[in-house]
A protein has these predicted regions:
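Intrinsically disordered, low-complexity boundary segments flanking structured domains
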Residues: 1-6, 82-86
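Structured beta-strand/loop patches that form or line metal/cofactor-binding pockets in enzymes
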Residues: 2-65
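Metal- or metallocofactor-binding catalytic centers and their adjacent structured scaffolds
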Residues: 14, 52-131
Length: 131
């Protein structure tokens, strides 16, 4: 007889984050560029978060940053990722709060929430695949 663990008993075993840049074929300009406040956007930084549970369930999430913040977003994600290890991947709202508190000194907006967003999408992906 095979024993199957309940989803609530499964735990996050590992988390991986990666970042890459998507170059734009044509730089994008807007009013901020026309007024001289910013340069044209030439690339988009994409943050990926991959989560796997002890039972082998996987979720993949992403977030992005335009013009600035990509390296900071990645650094923040790397710093808070270990807070997910050993946690119940189904308790997504609680994990959002835990990650927000893990990086509270950075703030609760901008690159902080963009970094958390990649984990959030990965957790929802994992939950959907498990359903």
């Amino acid at each position: 007889m095979t024993k199957t663990r309940l989803a609530a008993e499964d735990r996050i075993a590992w988390v991986r984050v990666a970042s890459c840049y998507l170059p734009l074929a044509t730089p994008i300009s807007d009013a901020k560029v026309l007024t001289g406040r910013q340069k044209p956007m030439t690339e988009i930084a994409i943050l990926f978060a991959e989560i796997e549970t002890a039972d082998g369930h996987q979720g993949l999430g992403f977030s992005y940053s335009k013009r600035a913040g990509g390296p900071g977003q990645f650094a923040h994600a790397k710093e808070i990722a270990p807070a997910l290890i050993g946690e119940d991947p189904s308790d997504i709202a609680r994990l959002w709060d835990k990650l927000a508190w893990a990086g509270a000194s950075v703030g609760r907006s901008g690159l902080s929430t963009q970094a958390i967003g990649a984990f959030d999408v990965a957790l929802w992906d994992l939950k959907a695949k498990r359903a």
